């Protein structure tokens, strides 16, 4: 590296503060999913109305994503992410004080949902301002890990805490942690180091309109958006309804939390291992085939398993393969839309993936009379099979 460019140790402080708020927003997102049934009884509402707590995040992301990316690009990540962090801290505490008032709890959740795009859409911007090119993938990986750990914590801790705490107190505790992480970010974050970490031209913009337009002219990119829509739709659907999926088979909210956590653990391992193998082999299409094909047995087990061992193993397998598809698809999108910046192509994939909230709603609407999600899970398996056709249209870019 040219000696005029310097890397500062403080970059890890900024990254840690950023990863922490990404962790807390995910815990707030998923906190009701493993206790859907008990929460419905507490608020006196239906399972679907509890599902709105998670769905609100996906609903809010769709209209806010592009304006927030523009804000990050125009005013910098520190201002934009601080806005999101403060929204998260304020509405996290408000949700805790809502008590048994479902309406107030839901509206405060929409406030939390409005905060999420400010955090997710800066994933490439923070590393671009502070890290050298060869460190940025690692930096984004750390934020991704924080995101997944936050989801896993929400899955595991919530049903455990529910055994000794009320739902409002659980939410207030999560809100307090969120407020702490928000204050920490505002105090510690800096927009840029004193001197740049790389040569001019290597910075990444959060959104570039020219890149946006070009991306949509690439046929393979459309198929990438389709498989991302399916993959994230199924992931969000399963995590949102995790407790309802296994409840008819006699499993408890604690079982649901363990199941969700194992799915996330499998996802973390898959998201590290599969993209690394894809990089080593320099093949994207092959590993996308493996990811979607491997997800089908996991989904089948989640649909029909009646023993906890088989159910947990199925969740791990589903998480391993389904989650691993996303980083590979994102890298593929970056390659086929080059020279479009990665922030633009990845942002579009996130946008389409969050738009799959429609599948989350369809899953609940397809429940059978006895409350079983089997019809919806069979649809998910059909969509995974359809993804194999879409992947067949995603040829690797010539090296």
Explain the meaning of each model-derived region.
Residues 2-8, 192-224:
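Juxtamembrane intracellular "pre-TM" segments in multi-pass secondary transporters
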Residues 282-329:
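C-terminal transmembrane helical hairpin of 12-TM major facilitator-type secondary transporters
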Residues 108-146:
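Cytoplasmic helix-loop-helix junction between adjacent transmembrane helices
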Residues 334-370:
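A late C-terminal transmembrane helix in Major Facilitator Superfamily
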Residues 63-101:
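Conserved MFS/SLC helix-loop-helix module at the cytosolic interface between two early adjacent transmembrane helices
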Residues 32-33, 218-261, 265-271, 360:
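Extracytoplasmic gate region of multi-pass secondary transporters
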């Amino acid at each position: 590296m040219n000696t005029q460019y310097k890397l500062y140790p403080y970059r890890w402080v900024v990254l840690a503060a950023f990863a922490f708020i990404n962790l807390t927003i995910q815990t707030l997102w998923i906190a009701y999913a493993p206790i859907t049934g008990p929460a419905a009884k507490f608020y006196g509402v239906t399972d679907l109305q509890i599902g709105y707590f998670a769905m609100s995040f996906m609903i809010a992301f769709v209209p806010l994503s592009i304006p927030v990316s523009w804000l990050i690009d125009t005013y910098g990540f520190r201002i934009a992410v601080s806005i999101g962090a403060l929204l998260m801290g304020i509405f996290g505490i408000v949700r805790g004080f809502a008590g048994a008032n479902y309406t107030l709890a839901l509206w405060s959740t929409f406030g939390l949902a409005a905060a999420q795009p400010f955090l997710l859409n800066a994933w490439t911007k923070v590393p671009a301002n502070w890290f050298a090119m060869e460190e940025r993938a690692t930096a984004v990986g750390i934020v991704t890990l924080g995101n997944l750990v936050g989801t896993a914590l929400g899955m595991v801790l919530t049903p455990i805490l529910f055994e000794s705490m009320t739902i409002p107190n659980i939410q207030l505790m999560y809100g307090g942690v969120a407020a702490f992480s928000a204050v920490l970010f505002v105090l510690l974050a800096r927009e840029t180091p004193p001197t740049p970490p790389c040569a001019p031209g290597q910075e990444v913009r959060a959104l570039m309109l020219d890149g946006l337009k070009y991306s949509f002219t690439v046929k393979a990119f459309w198929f990438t958006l389709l498989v991302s829509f399916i993959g994230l739709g199924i992931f969000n659907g399963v995590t949102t309804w995790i407790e309802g999926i296994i409840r008819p088979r006699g499993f408890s909210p604690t079982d649901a939390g363990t199941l969700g956590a194992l799915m996330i653990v499998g996802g973390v391992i898959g998201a590290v291992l599969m993209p690394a193998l894809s990089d080593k082999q320099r093949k994207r299409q092959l590993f996308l085939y493996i990811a979607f094909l491997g997800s089908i047995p996991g989904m089948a087990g989640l649909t029909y398993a009646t023993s906890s061992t088989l159910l947990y193993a199925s969740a791990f397998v589903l998480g391993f393969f389904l989650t691993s598809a996303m980083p590979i698809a994102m890298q593929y999108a970056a390659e086929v839309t080059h020279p479009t910046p990665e922030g633009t192509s990845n942002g579009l994939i996130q946008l389409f993936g969050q738009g799959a909230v429609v599948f989350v709603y369809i899953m609940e609407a397809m429940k059978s009379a006895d409350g079983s999600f089997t019809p919806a899970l069979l649809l998910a398996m059909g969509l995974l099979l359809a993804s194999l056709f879409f992947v067949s249209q995603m040829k690797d870019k010539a090296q």
